[in-house]
Amino acid sequence: IAGPKSKELLISLTNSENPEQLFSNENFPWLSSKEIEINMIPTLAIRVAYTGELGWELHYPVEFQNKLLDLLLLSGKNFDLKLVGARAQNWLRQEKSYRAFGNELGRDACLVEAGLEKFINFNKEFLGKDALQKRNIKSKCVTLLIDGPKDCDPWGREAIYKDGKTIGRLTSGGYSV
């Protein structure tokens, strides 16, 4: 569930005694999770959205899939809920510079190369810290906004050139409006 009204939608569905407090930014910060109940469906809500907007991933037993979707759609009418597809979600994540496994993230790029060093605390010990500090950083993932020809259709894996030399590769691409 993602978007500016996602919190209100979840508040309307949860069985909590004080849902506003449960879903407050102080009690439910970004990248945290809580066990909640939606109409007696045990649900793990994770405060993260692939779109970069306010949102939650909902994890629940698969046998409740249809029931939960029906509840979300019914209650979602009051919040102008719209279903979106994977391409829309992918374009939204690109606009927010979110990285995707298989595109920007993979076995060949460390967090620094992926542009995610803000998630590394070098003041703490962690597995691989020494190797990461010694690693020769050869590339860096950055977000480019290209104001180019209207017939340009970037998708991913295209080479990036400067002065006739390949200087990188596009990992993801798409249009933004």
Model-assigned labels for residue ranges:
Residues 1-177:
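Conserved, structured C-terminal
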